[in-house]
Each structure stands twice: as C-alpha cells, then as structure tokens.
C-alpha cells in the first residue's frame, strides 16, 4: 500500500450526487478526494438517464420515418427506412463520453483529486482503495461522504445471463431481438420497452400489479397504457412471474392460469436498491432504513462527520435529488447554513406519452387532510399540441380550497417533462392559483395548459 493520502472531504462514488458535491466543495476551497471505480457520472450518465433518453429519441425518430413511409397527414413521404443499431449505439456512447469527459474536466478545474478504484470502508475516517491500475491506496479524511448509488434488483427465479438481461445490456444492444419480454411495468421497463417496440421489436410487458406504473394514479397512467396498446405492446397485467421457460418465461394470472410468453430476450426491470453491500459499509454500524442509510434533513448519518446522499439514502431515487443533496453537504462542510427540505421533487417517466408529477396528487392531498380544488386542462384544447400531433393528455393542478395555495401538479402528454421546472418552481415559491393564472404565458406553447389549468380551478378557463 502506498503512502496515506489525507484530505478534508472524501467522497465515495462519482455519480450525480458525488461529483456535484465534489465540484461545489472544490469551489468552496475544501480539499476533496473523490473515489470512483467505474466511469464518472455513475448509473445516470453511463447506463441510466442519459443513454436511455438517447435510445428513446433514436427509436422515436425511426418510428417517424416508418410512419412517413406509409401515409402522413403532413404530406411527407419517404422510402421505407432501416436502422443500423450499431451506429445508433455508437452515437449514444459518444454523448455519454462527451458528458463524462465534461465531468472530469470540471472536477480537475476545481482541484478535486479523482482516484480511480473501489473503496472499502475501514472506519468513519478512512477507506482502502483497490486501484483500477493495480495496487491499493489508504485515504484518511475529516468528512466522509457516502454516495455509492444503487443497483438493479435481480430476481432469484430469473437470474441474469444469456437471454436474460438488465437495463445495462438493453441500452447497448449488439443486435435487436425479434421478441422482448419486459418483466416489470415501472418507468424503467416501460421506457425501454417502448423504445424497443418503436425499433420494430415485438414487446410484451409482465407486471404483477393490475396496472402499469403502479406508483402513479390511474388517471395519469391510463393514456400511457392506451398508447402502449396502440403501439402493439402486449400488457400482461396482474400476472406473476413463475420463472424461465424453454422459449421465454412462464407467468400466472390472477385466476391461477399459467401460460408461456415467448421471447428471444427477457429484460428484468423490477426496480433498484441502494448499493449498501460489498464495501464494508456495515462496519460503521450506521442507522439504516432497510437497505438505505438513514439520514436527517442535512444528510447526516448517525455517525459524526459521515454523510450519505442520493440513492444510498433511499427514496426517491432521482439524480436531481442526489445533486441537490451533494451541493448542500459541501456547503454545510464549508460552514454554511443549509437544510434539505424541498417543497417538492419532480419525477418524470419518459414513456410515450410522458408523465410528470410534482407535489401532492389529489389522493395524497386528501389523505393529508387537505380540502383541495382539482382541475385539469386537456392538450386537445391546446393549439401547440395540435401542431405537434400531440393532443393526448392533460395538465392537472391541485390547490388548497381555502387560500388557493398550489400543492401539486401532474401532467401526461408529449414533452411534458419540460413542464417539470415550472411545476417545481411554483411549488417551491409558494404560488397560488392566481399567481399562475395571472402570469402571461407565451402563445402557442404547451405551457399554456398550465395557466389554463389554474384558470379552470378558479372557475374561468378561457379555452374550454
């Protein structure tokens, strides 16, 4: 083992939370070491958020081209297209490489020492790193920030290998299967399943719950289910997985009837879990919430000067939550007064149509004892949506009846992910219905549906 490396802040994990914490710490003049065994950017940048959106975009463009090869109301006609999936993957990888290089450059710019290797906890002040290039390095610190992220949940009855793949393999196909079965009807399975279907693959989704996206209310998920069926995706809802079969998988429905679903490949997408095993984290004896490290509203763990952020600290497992926590921890270590208490953290499903939620749903508001106004505005009445051939879906607002304080937003439709900023900002700033309704929204935009939903809640929507 080489000479001991000493630092003020040691960060384990170079994903969105870890690298943002490192950059902010560097900006604040805190000597910082970041340890990452894989590529900078973590799951999100390398095998999650970014590559999946690239594949989704490529699949959508291919579907458009196929549509134009038949009949298009726009008058566009092209010859039947083909796709070179290897080139698609190269394009996707180039985006990832550019972004990871950018992260590395930012860390270097702010004086962060990046150590490539796998950290193993020794105690609350030190780790041993198995260096990627061979050998080992002991690092000691004043503050230890745990940002190890999460990993895919595996199914013992359907182990990975051969034709059974995880989202990581699904994002880098060497070739496209003829038929794909997706196990899991959550956002990961549906995003990838939709992309594969648009690329021409026959897709079936198996979900144990009676509907897709069970974490969202049915009014939001119904348009997604309808769109999937129109696309030709087979939905086996309320079906439990029994295991692999010779030609695919075996499932059982609610009535106890078993059947085989044929597949060339099976994608397991049944969720993620904190990466809290395999690097001696348990030796610290930290308070835990199941597999997640328990933290307070400053991301402090039960051990002094040991912090945890992002997926390792539990739900919601979102990159933007991890980034916000990472920035906050760096500022706390620098002596600033901070607290992680967002009014809302937006969440997006990049299905087709997309789904975005921020704050309380009508049901959640009711459960919280709030008497609320709930109003929706359909994209069928929005001019911009019509010009985009995307008049499916709606924007919904939830606001207190007594003072009109907005407590929640939901939307389903084309490109509604871009409304998430407006939703979160209005909630964070304590906007009331009158604030949204009285703000002039540019025309023609999808965002006008936000204003119209607020107007409708007040009883005087203009375009419906």
Curated annotation (Swiss-Prot):
It catalyses: N(6)-[(R)-dihydrolipoyl]-L-lysyl-[protein] + NAD(+) = N(6)-[(R)-lipoyl]-L-lysyl-[protein] + NADH + H(+). Its main location: cytoplasm. Keywords: Cytoplasm, Disulfide bond, FAD, Flavoprotein, NAD, Oxidoreductase, Redox-active center. Binds 1 FAD per subunit. PROSITE patterns: PYRIDINE_REDOX_1 (PS00076). The keyword Disulfide bond applies. It is found in: Cytoplasm. Its cofactor is FAD. The active site is at 443 (proton acceptor). Belongs to the class-I pyridine nucleotide-disulfide oxidoreductase family. The active site is a redox-active disulfide bond. Homodimer. This is Dihydrolipoyl dehydrogenase.
